[in-house]
Amino acid sequence: MGPGPSRAAGVLRPLLGMLALMVAASNRAASAFNLDTRFLVVKEAGNPGSLFGYSVALHRQTERQQRYLLLAGAPRDLAVPDGYTNRTGAVYLCPLTAHKNDCERMDIKEKSNPNHIIEDMWLGVTVASQGPAGRVLVCAHRYTQVLWSGSEDQRRMVGKCYVRGNDLELDARDDWQTYHNEMCNSNTDYLETGMCQLGTSGGFTQNTVYFGAPGAYNWKGNSYMIQRKDWDLSEYSYKDPEDQGNLYIGYTMQVGSAILHPTNITIVTGAPRHQHVGAVFLLSQEAGGDLRRRQVLEGTQVGAYFGSAIALADLNNDGWQDLLVGAPYYFERKEEVGGAIYIFMNQAGTSFPDHPSLLLHGPSRSAFGFSVASIGDVNQDGFQDIAVGAPFEGLGKVYIYHGSSRGLLRQPQQVIHGEQLGLPGLATFGYSLSGQMDVDENFYPDLLVGSLSDRIVLLRARPVINILHKTLVAKPSILDPAFCTATSCVQVELCFAYNQSAGNPNYRRNITLAYTLEADRDRRPPRLHFARSQSAVFHGFFSMPEMRCQTLELLLMDNVRDKLRPITISMNYSLPLRLPDRPQLGLGSLDAYPVLNQAQALENHTEVQFQKECGQDNRCDSNLQMRAAFVSELGQRLSRLQYRRDLRKLLLSINVTNTPSRKRAGEDAHEALLTLEVPPTLLLSSVRPPGACQANETIVCELGNPFKRNQRMELLIAFEVIGVTLHTRELQAQLQLSTSSHQDDLRPMTLPLLVDYTLQASLSMVNHRLQSFFGGTVMGESGMKTVEDVGSPLKYEFQVGPMGEGLAALGTLVLGLEWPYEVSNGKWLLYPTEITVHGNGSWHCQPPGDLINPLNLTLSVPGDGPPSPQRRRRQLDPGGGQGPPPVTLAAAKKAKSEIQLSCGSDHTHCVWLECPIPDAPVITNVTIQARVWNSTFIEDYRDFDRVRVASWATLFLRTGVPTINMENKTVRFSVDIDSDLVEELPAEIELWLVLVAVSAGLLLLGLIILLLWKCGFFKRARTRALYEAKRQKAEMKSQPSETERLTEDY
């Protein structure tokens, strides 16, 4: 026996295995609509594990008694005890009561014998009702006939279907019930119809009964139909050959008219394994009992089981049935999608599109689309609705989708969660569905939902209320605050009426609406409030049908600024109902629990205008215009800002007008504002006129409320300039005029201001004028070894003040010097020996051209040995000393003869020296050490008492950025070189040496006196000798001194 397909053997077992591995999927939000989940009718199986609810149907019994029944198939139910059979399945009929266990077993008399096997025949795999006053179809697709060949038997699982009367009893007088319905030949094998499994699907129309047989022809499958017209009976089957088996044609089946023909019927049958992607065949009747293929709609994903569930419904009310196809195993891993419903909209009876008009998805692992059913117009809006089961999403869910003039709405209008029903043991809720019948006779069709957990649930539809004449009127419609009283400014009148969407004229229930009125909802603070309170919100109740209208008073708030835009008074309403917190069992009337039609707007609004001087149309057409410019403190327009660190203020001049033009009336501009957005470098300092502007994240200036016709206004805004850097190229302000009056040409104005950054570095010298000397002997270059051999030292110290911000890669600060290098005949003048830079660190500067110490003479080290013989006389301070400058002989003589050598003269040849100055926040010292070339001065300037050598140094900026500049700083420097030095002042003698010398002198003087006395020096001489001595002394006094003799030579 081949593995014949069935919802039991081929689908149920793997699904039951999957159920243990499923996880609860995320809940999909959907507002509850009119299928009630609080007052339930629940039925349970008497025998657990019978799969009670595997198939369900709603049925109306009109014979013998008037009642509505819930039909449930239990294909694994125990058999009626006969001593031979254990399990056959069953069909139960359940009355509409509050009891769970009052279902009755339908009497299907079938006994087991050697020629056929009813054990495990799955009676109840298909249950269908023909509709009001119609018959009932029950199938057992695993019914097996036995062929005997001697002692051996061959079993043929051909399936069997039973038709019973409206009262679910067998009426032998009814040909529908007595006909054998044996469409499959058990004398053939599985390659023909010997394993057809008839009844896997089936149903009724008014004059036909149809069956699906997916096991026929090697499980290619087939569809059968029996049609009765008066006393004629015709059998139809699909006999077109297919290329392969295992298509499962007939797995599901629907028959109806207005599909591909206005009146003729079309058979729609699913083949979920066609080409591995599944398909739906559309078949039509042909003469001779054949069903001809008209169209095949194929699935899009392998293994999705496209075609395992189908439904027909006129979704857009165009008179043609549209097609819905389930693919419960469709998935998109990245999108967390599990299951799909394909919607094919009928193209006016010609065909269906090859691709779905709409594709609905369910959550991952939900088997969304395992069941799908047309449930009628559940909300009575004129369009058919559908239900989709997702039995493995949590405990199971049922999605309700509504039809519309555009077709099926994409979003579900209601999602019914199995968890919310509060039924212990419930699982796989939504496994089977049946609708299109109003079992509680409230004019709304209800829905029966089955499961694999031996439970079925009836969900009844609640009445839907349409709110009519929801009028909201405000008086006066144009408000003049001058006419407001202490108790009222505005009167609001609201009126309601309703009807039932099903049009039941007897439905006259007392309904109370809860409504909320809100004044100026979109503005804070609001401009109106209700007289009963200080609030702009009012909550009230409205009883229908007794109450017709209500009137409320509103007052105007104080200090209302906005008198241009209307005040909107909005109203929304709802229908509060007291429902039980938990679901209850019972069949009480749902008329007391209506719901509002969600397709209607649940709110309304009206507007109140202010009285304005804006013409007869009450619309203010303003003509705000603006001119703006950055200006200097003298009022001059600026196109470029010359920025310096000491710059503090920048002014912005703005002129605003509201004058009529040819295009605009120039009427009052209400709530006229000027908004400025400026960069963080501009900080608001002051405004003229004072108080016109306020600064927060932006600068907002109030121009007037209103800014009247022909009014003009000038604003002068002062900014403090902070944070401008070398990278700042432009300052940009954006200005925007706004008004609540009508003016649609207001555009932002962008006001750019280019920035030229002026650096403010400084240059100074420690000593602008140095003094030195020359003298001694002439020495050639070849004889010089150290810089001391060149001449007396010079030391120039320049100080560069910090410029504030570092240039980095934007440029370089450079100290340049015109250096007196040679005299006109090419002899050395001032010989540079070393340039050092001290800032953030210390380093040597080497200008290009090998101009510093080009002879590579050995530099002097401070403190090394005595000076050379040429420097034995006292040397002059080379500059930078703390004491007074030494006085030369020439200086003492007031420099009788002097010559000046300077760069730019014919006597001097100068070279250009450059040293880059690094970025530093501190003063940078540049020290230039040099030597007077002694030999040049001795040879060429020995006739001069003083030679003055003068030049200059310039600090300048070298950059390629045109917006960065700096004023060059120039200092002049010189050195006076004298031809000789004054004699050195005597050195100070220590006190103890003076005392010793005085004592020694006194001792020597005493010894001399003693010797003179011994020699008789002190004895009185004769008179003659005395005179001779005096004469001699006088002669001595007349002789000139040595100094006098020296001066007489000059």
UniProtKB/Swiss-Prot annotation:
Subunit (UniProt): Heterodimer of an alpha and a beta subunit. The alpha subunit is composed of a heavy and a light chain linked by a disulfide bond. Alpha-3 associates with beta-1. Interacts with HPS5. Interacts with FAP (seprase); the interaction occurs at the cell surface of invadopodia membrane in a collagen-dependent manner.
Native organism taxonomy: Eukaryota, Metazoa, Chordata, Craniata, Vertebrata
FG-GAP repeats: 38-103, 108-170, 184-234, 235-291, 292-353, 355-410, 414-476
Disulfide bonds: 94-103, 139-161, 184-196, 484-489, 495-549, 614-620, 693-701, 845-903, 910-915
Motif (GFFKR motif): 1016-1020
Signal peptide: 1-32
Membrane topology of this protein: Single-pass type I membrane protein; Lipid-anchor
Extracellular side: 33-990
One annotated Gene Ontology cellular component of this protein: integrin complex
Residues given in the record as Ca(2+) 2 binding sites: 377, 379, 381, 385
Pfam family, one: Integrin_A_Ig_1
Official protein name in the record: Integrin alpha-3
GO biological process: cell adhesion mediated by integrin; cell-cell adhesion; integrin-mediated signaling pathway; leukocyte migration; positive regulation of protein localization to plasma membrane
Span list, region Disordered: 859-888
Gene Ontology MF, one: protein heterodimerization activity
Ligand binding (Ca(2+) 3): 438, 440, 442, 444, 446
Entry comment on modification after translation: Phosphorylated on serine residues.
Name of the gene: ITGA3
Function of the molecule: Integrin alpha-3/beta-1 is a receptor for fibronectin, laminin, collagen, epiligrin, thrombospondin and CSPG4. Integrin alpha-3/beta-1 provides a docking site for FAP (seprase) at invadopodia plasma membranes in a collagen-dependent manner and hence may participate in the adhesion, formation of invadopodia and matrix degradation processes, promoting cell invasion. Alpha-3/beta-1 may mediate with LGALS3 the stimulation by CSPG4 of endothelial cells migration.
Transmembrane segment boundaries: 991-1011
Chain residues carrying a lipid of type S-palmitoyl cysteine: 1015
Region entry Interaction with HPS5, spans: 1014-1020
Residues binding Ca(2+) 1: 314, 316, 318, 322
